[in-house]
């Protein structure tokens, strides 16, 4: 979850509580095939970088979901995004479904700036040409949860492919630059390790 310290410690505590509630709600919805694990609120460039590095190094992590509860200055996301190797989903939502017009004050407005923060995050991702899935909608809505679930299944397939071994029998070994060039590209782009076995191995 993205935030910042500008609005004080109470705001950060509220962001943390709301984020936990959202993650628990998503996991308890029964709509998601993979468990979402909350990794805390990132309030600085170093904290963002630490979260993304941890995601890269965690074999159980198949993707990262980001959400900006309040305004999170996007320059602090640059170094983390440059290092992220896992699939990324940007969840453009807000904690409250309805705006409390009768009771809304500046504290509420400072705390709940998803529209501002998510737009800022979307800008830096586009500026950096970061490949990502963007899901827009209220986090409790089934349609939103369905879109997250579809992305999760794609991530699961991607994660499985990272250590996949493919055997090609009777491979074409003439003009190796072409055939092995495709194998190199398959491993570089998709994680598929392709080996050759002669057709006699099938006998």
Model-derived segments and their meaning:
Residues 1-203:
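Metallocofactor- and cofactor-centric catalytic cores in central/energy metabolism, strongly enriched
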């Amino acid at each position: 979850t993205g935030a910042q310290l500008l609005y004080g410690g109470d705001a950060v505590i509220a962001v943390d509580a709301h984020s936990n509630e959202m993650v628990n709600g998503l996991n308890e919805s029964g709509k998601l095939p993979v468990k979402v694990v909350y990794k805390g609120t990132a309030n600085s460039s170093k904290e963002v970088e630490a979260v993304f590095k941890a995601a890269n190094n965690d074999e159980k992590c198949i993707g990262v979901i980001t959400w900006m509860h309040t305004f999170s200055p996007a320059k602090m996301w640059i170094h983390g995004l440059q290092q992220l190797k896992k699939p990324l989903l940007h969840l453009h939502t807000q904690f409250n479904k309805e705006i409390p017009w009768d009771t809304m004050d500046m504290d509420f407005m400072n705390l709940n700036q998803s529209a501002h923060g998510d737009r800022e995050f979307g800008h830096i991702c586009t500026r950096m040409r970061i490949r990502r899935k963007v899901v827009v909608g209220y986090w409790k809505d089934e349609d939103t949860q369905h879109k997250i679930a579809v992305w999760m299944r794609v991530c699961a397939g991607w994660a499985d492919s990272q250590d996949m071994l493919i055997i090609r029998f009777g491979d074409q070994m003439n003009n190796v630059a072409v055939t092995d060039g495709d194998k190199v590209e398959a491993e570089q782009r998709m994680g598929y390790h392709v080996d050759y076995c002669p057709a006699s191995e099938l006998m």
